[in-house]
Amino acid sequence: MKFAVLKFPGSNCDRDMYNAALKSDVEAEYVDYRNTSLDGFDGVLIPGGFSFGDYLRSGAMASVAPITEAVKQFAKEGKPVLGVCNGFQILTEIGLLPGALLHNDSHLFVSRNESLRVVNHNTAFTNLYNEDETVVYPVAHGEGHYYCTQDMYDRLEANNQIILKYVNNPNGSFNDIAGIINEQGNVCGMMPHPERAIEPILGTDSGVKLFQAMVNSWREQNV
């Protein structure tokens, strides 16, 4: 398996994503935002940071970068896509995931470890966790408040698209939502950082299982 790690001007978690992929015993390669093809890749990782300085709003300018059309096609083909933090914001901006990310209720940047509850463990991203398992991922964002209408939330619930919820909501996200998937189950977005949770020496290795689940799920279908 080979992951594409996208790089935009202002990305700052691309190395963490790259290392998380390598730790899962697969290949990874950085892909510049000006590229227009994802040929040769089996998965896409969209890292956190402040793409294009977060001008207009987080992820807005990245959403019209050349690489995003390739990401849409990649997702349409059923291949796995993970967007974390700014990557989640980009996925909502390009319409691969529902909802939007707003400023934190506190209007402050939040940076700390957060406990999360695994709401749905029957996905390609969470199937190595137990249902209702508590995991710990770092968060680092100023615009992490996940917003959706009640109707959208009801659809997310009905389709089991909510995969992670905050134990102690740090940003005002609707019904504590921390991470979701698309209806097809191959696109995942979350504000917390699993790629920063892969080394026990840094306080938590809860994120290892998420990347390994992605790899295992791909291998089950393709090897």
UniProtKB/Swiss-Prot annotation:
Signal peptide from the UniProt entry: none
Residue span, Glutamine amidotransferase type-1 domain: 2-223
EC code: 6.3.5.3, 3.5.1.2
UniProt keyword Translocase present: no
One of the GO BP terms on file: 'de novo' IMP biosynthetic process
Active site: 85, 193, 195
Reactions performed catalytically: N(2)-formyl-N(1)-(5-phospho-beta-D-ribosyl)glycinamide + L-glutamine + ATP + H2O = 2-formamido-N(1)-(5-O-phospho-beta-D-ribosyl)acetamidine + L-glutamate + ADP + phosphate + H(+); L-glutamine + H2O = L-glutamate + NH4(+)
Alphabetized Pfam families for the sequence: GATase_5
GO CC aspect terms: cytoplasm
Subcellular location: Cytoplasm
Molecular functions (GO terms): ATP binding; glutaminase activity; phosphoribosylformylglycinamidine synthase activity
SUPFAM superfamilies, per the entry: Class I glutamine amidotransferase-like
Superkingdom of origin organism: Bacteria
Pathway terms, separated by semicolons: Purine metabolism; IMP biosynthesis via de novo pathway; 5-amino-1-(5-phospho-D-ribosyl)imidazole from N(2)-formyl-N(1)-(5-phospho-D-ribosyl)glycinamide: step 1/2
Keywords in alphabetical order: ATP-binding, Cytoplasm, Glutamine amidotransferase, Hydrolase, Ligase, Nucleotide-binding, Purine biosynthesis
Function: Part of the phosphoribosylformylglycinamidine synthase complex involved in the purines biosynthetic pathway. Catalyzes the ATP-dependent conversion of formylglycinamide ribonucleotide (FGAR) and glutamine to yield formylglycinamidine ribonucleotide (FGAM) and glutamate. The FGAM synthase complex is composed of three subunits. PurQ produces an ammonia molecule by converting glutamine to glutamate. PurL transfers the ammonia molecule to FGAR to form FGAM in an ATP-dependent manner.
Xref: NCBIfam families: FGAM_synth_I, PRK03619.1
PANTHER family hit by this protein: PHOSPHORIBOSYLFORMYLGLYCINAMIDINE SYNTHASE SUBUNIT PURQ (PTHR47552:SF1)
Subunit-structure text: Part of the FGAM synthase complex composed of 1 PurL, 1 PurQ and 2 PurS subunits.
The protein's name: Phosphoribosylformylglycinamidine synthase subunit PurQ
Organism: Staphylococcus saprophyticus subsp. saprophyticus (strain ATCC 15305 / DSM 20229 / NCIMB 8711 / NCTC 7292 / S-41)
